[in-house]
């Protein structure tokens, strides 16, 4: 028996390993087809400044881009932004930028805004955005250096320079919010919608 009642697998418009694992662990069959969109360009063209709205727009644009190539398929787009006050962060391009981000976040509380959008035939049928609040402990230069040495590529593959599901958890004093939101996919609202659409067995 499979939990999924859809005639075709869900399409995930992302190459995020964390998002893929969340869907896999929830028993949702999917095909990962990353959306090739210019995220910075979309953000600038939108004129949006709210981290939550930026995440929502990018999630929708990713799903729309993939939906155009796959008529009839249900496509899931997702995005996450990190905000420290009015300032938003992108994935650090290299180790030096990861170091700078961690220095800035050290000893302060920031927010992770995670958004999802479900699109079919170019139309958004469901969208959700949620927030988690993360308090990073005061880090010394030696601790930042040691963390980056151990984290390797994980430090430049996630916004903020950390993956909380891995070694990044050592950087925090407090975490407030949904675990799935922190990992970049508000899973419970997604499952609730799929259940309402009779796409899940229970």
From Swiss-Prot:
Q: Which GO terms describe its molecular function?
A: nucleoside triphosphate diphosphatase activity
Q: Which EC number applies?
A: 3.6.1.9
Q: Which cofactor does it need?
A: a divalent metal cation
SUPFAM superfamilies assigned = ITPase-like
Record Gene3D superfamilies: 3.90.950.10
What are the positions of the active site? 79
Superkingdom of this entry's organism? Bacteria
NCBIfam families annotated for this entry? Answer: maf
Quote the protein name from its UniProt record. Nucleoside triphosphate pyrophosphatase
Which species expresses this protein natively? Rhodopseudomonas palustris (strain BisB18)
């Amino acid at each position: 028996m499979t939990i999924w009642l859809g005639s075709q697998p869900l399409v995930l418009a992302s190459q995020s390993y964390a998002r893929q694992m969340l869907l896999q662990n929830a028993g949702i069959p999917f095909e990962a087809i990353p959306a090739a969109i210019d995220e910075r360009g979309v953000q600038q063209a939108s004129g949006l400044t709210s981290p939550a709205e930026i995440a929502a727009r990018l999630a929708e644009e990713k799903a729309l881009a993939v939906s155009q190539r796959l008529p009839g398929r249900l496509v899931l787009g997702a995005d996450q932004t990190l905000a420290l006050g009015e300032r938003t962060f992108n994935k650090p391009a290299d180790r030096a930028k990861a170091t700078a981000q961690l220095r800035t976040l050290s000893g302060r509380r920031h927010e992770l805004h995670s958004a999802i959008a479900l699109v079919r035939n170019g139309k958004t049928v469901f969208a959700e955005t949620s927030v988690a609040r993360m308090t990073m402990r005061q880090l010394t230069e030696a601790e930042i250096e040691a963390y980056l040495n151990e984290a390797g590529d994980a430090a430049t593959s996630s916004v903020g320079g950390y993956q909380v599901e891995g070694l990044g958890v050592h950087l925090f004093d407090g975490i407030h919010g949904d675990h799935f939101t922190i990992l970049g996919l508000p899973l419970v609202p997604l499952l609730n919608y799929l259940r309402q659409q009779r796409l899940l067995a229970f």
